[in-house]
């Protein structure tokens, strides 16, 4: 059996990157000025046969940082009331500190080197997480500073769809539009979608890579 056929560990699959699925809900589009209101994260794992699956889930409602913009259109879109005491919101520091702690443990346990964000239209989520981490003065950010796995692009390639709901449905997954734009629900769906795309590529024979033929 070739060495490539043995590549069933998470650290082998993504060049040492530890994929973590993230979704955020915000009060606008500007990561520097608009509030981060909700964040969810799901770590991933591989079984002994190399199939990817969701692992640990974390979810936080987040207090707007001091001076944050709250765009009415964004709040109407996601249905979040930042002043609702029942949200149980925590500071950006508390939410990201806990996520980063769990992610660092996962990196170590899996033998990976660094985390990489998986998200749908990932630049948006990545920019808000990075901005919040900077505001919170969190120096040990385990995520790559710019590289991401964008499921909008991956789903466009694998499924011919770039909208999360349509990509999930095309992949044979349930998608409840009434729960959409909840960071927790969108993260769960994105995690399952990413695993399906990665596992589908494996089922089609794309991974492990075939060994180079000896001359």
Swiss-Prot record:
Keyword tRNA processing among record annotations: yes
Co-factor note (free text): Binds two Mg(2+) per subunit. The active form of the enzyme binds two Mg(2+) ions in its active site. The first Mg(2+) forms only one salt bridge with the protein.
Key words of the record: Exonuclease, Hydrolase, Magnesium, Metal-binding, Nuclease, tRNA processing
Top-level taxon of origin: Bacteria
Pfam family, one: RNase_T
PANTHER family reported for this sequence: DNA POLYMERASE III SUBUNIT EPSILON, RIBONUCLEASE T
The protein's name in its UniProt record: Ribonuclease T
Organism: Shigella boydii serotype 4 (strain Sb227)
